[in-house]
From Swiss-Prot:
Lipid-anchored residues (S-diacylglycerol cysteine): 22
Subcellular location: Cell membrane
N-palmitoyl cysteine: lipidated positions: 22
A Pfam entry, by short name: DUF4097
Membrane topology note: Lipid-anchor
Disulfide-bonded cysteines: none
Protein name: Uncharacterized lipoprotein TP_0839
InterPro entries cross-referenced by the UniProt entry: Toastrack_DUF4097
Signal peptide range: 1-21
GO cellular component terms attached to this protein's record: plasma membrane
Length: 335
C-alpha cells in the first residue's frame, strides 16, 4: 500500500471515529433535553457508573396526573445525576407512593439528589411544577433561535465534560429540589441528601427526619419538627416560624437563623459560624441548647457571651435566660 492509500485510510478512520463520537455526544444531549426520565434511569451510561452498577432497575408507574411514581414495594434509592434539574415530587393518589417529575433537565455540571419512597420535601397542597408552557401558536424566529442556542450550548458542555472530564474548572450551578406533599399528609422518616443546591421545606410536619445539605442553602418556613436532625456544612440555614420539638439544627461554617417556638428540648449550633435565634413568648419549661463553638450567638438581637446567669428581655412580659454548662448555652424561660 503506497503512502497516498495509507493516508486516505487514516483520514477515513479519523472521520468515522469523529462522526461516531459526535453522534454519541449529540444523542446524550438530546436525551437530556427531552427529559426522558425512564430511559435516563436505565441508560448504559448510568449502568456503567460505579455508584449505580449494582442497583436494580426501579419499578415505576404513571398516575393520572402524569407523574412517574416509584413502586413502594421496591424502595431503592434513586440518584438523579444531572444539573439545572428541577424535580417535582408528590404522593401518588393511586398507591400513596412517591412520585417524581423532572421539569427541566440540561447538562452542565453533575449533581446528585437522593430520593427514596420515605423522602418527601417542600410544601403542602397542590403540585408546584414550575415549567414554562409553550405558546399556542408556532414558535417565532426568536424562540427558534433560542432553542437552537440552548441545544448547541448543552451539546458543547456535554462534549467538554465527556472529553476533558470534570476537573477542568466546571462551575457549580445551584438547583432547587421541589417535592410536594398533599395537605392531609405529614412526613415521617424523611431522609434527604443534597449538594450544591437550595432546599426548602414549607408548611409541613416532619418526624424522625435526617436532612444533610452540603454547600447548600436550607430554608424552613412554618415547619414543625419532631425528633429531627438538620445539618448543613457551608450553607446557611433559615428556620422561620418553626416549631421545634426534640430537634437538632446545625451548621458548620454558615449562619443559622431561627425564630419560632419550642415544644420540646432542642439544640441548635454552629462550629465556626453564627447562630441567630429569636423568641417572643414564654415556651413553658422547654429549653434550647446552643452550641456556638468558635462562632457567635445572638439571641433576640443581643450578643450572648459565654457567661453564667445571662438573662434577656423578650420584648414582652417573659424573660429569657441563658445558662452555660461546660461550654453549652442553654436558653430557657424561667418559671
Amino acid at each position: 500500500m503506497d503512502k497516498k492509500a495509507r493516508a486516505h485510510t487514516v483520514i477515513v478512520c479519523l472521520v468515522g471515529a469523529l462522526s461516531l463520537a459526535c453522534a454519541y455526544l449529540l444523542g446524550g444531549s438530546m436525551k437530556y433535553l427531552r427529559g426522558d426520565v425512564s430511559r435516563f434511569w436505565t441508560s448504559s451510561r448510568m449502568q456503567r457508573h460505579p455508584a449505580h452498577s449494582s442497583q436494580p432497575v426501579v419499578r415505576t408507574f404513571t398516575d393520572a396526573d402524569g407523574y412517574t411514581c416509584l413502586d413502594q414495594a421496591h424502595p431503592h434509592t434513586i440518584v438523579i445525576d444531572a444539573t439545572r434539574v428541577r424535580v417535582s415530587v408528590q404522593v401518588c393518589a393511586q398507591r400513596r407512593s412517591l412520585a417524581y417529575k423532572v421539569v427541566k433537565n440540561s447538562v452542565y455540571d453533575p449533581l446528585s439528589i437522593h430520593l427514596d419512597p420515605t423522602m418527601l420535601v417542600l410544601r403542602r397542597g397542590k403540585k408546584t411544577v414550575r415549567e414554562s408552557t409553550p405558546p399556542a401558536d408556532s414558535p417565532g424566529v426568536m424562540q427558534s433561535a433560542l432553542n437552537v442556542r440552548d441545544t448547541l450550548r448543552d451539546w458543547f458542555y456535554t462534549f467538554w465534560k465527556n472529553v476533558w472530564g470534570s476537573r477542568w474548572g466546571h462551575s457549580v450551578v445551584p438547583i432547587e429540589a421541589i417535592i410536594c406533599v398533599p395537605a392531609q399528609h405529614n412526613v415521617h422518616n424523611l431522609k434527604v441528601r443534597v449538594k450544591d443546591s437550595s432546599l426548602r421545606l414549607e408548611g409541613i410536619e416532619v418526624r424522625f427526619a435526617d436532612v444533610y445539605a452540603h454547600a447548600s442553602e436550607l430554608k424552613l418556613n412554618g415547619v414543625r419538627t419532631d425528633r429531627t436532625l438538620l445539618h448543613t456544612t457551608d450553607g446557611d440555614t433559615q428556620c422561620s416560624r418553626c416549631v421545634l420539638s426534640d430537634a437538632h439544627l446545625y451548621t458548620d461554617r454558615g449562619t443559622l437563623s431561627f425564630d419560632g417556638t419550642l415544644q420540646g428540648n432542642s439544640e441548635i449550633g454552629t462550629r465556626t459560624g453564627t447562630v441567630v435565634a429569636r423568641f417572643t413568648e414564654r415556651q413553658s419549661y422547654y429549653a434550647l441548647s446552643v452550641f456556638s463553638g468558635h462562632g457567635a450567638v445572638y439571641i433576640n438581637d443581643q450578643r450572648v457571651r459565654k457567661t453564667l446567669g445571662t438573662c434577656l428581655s423578650t420584648g414582652g412580659s417573659a424573660q429569657l435566660c441563658v445558662r452555660n454548662e461546660r461550654g453549652v448555652l442553654h436558653v430557657y424561660f424561667p418559671q
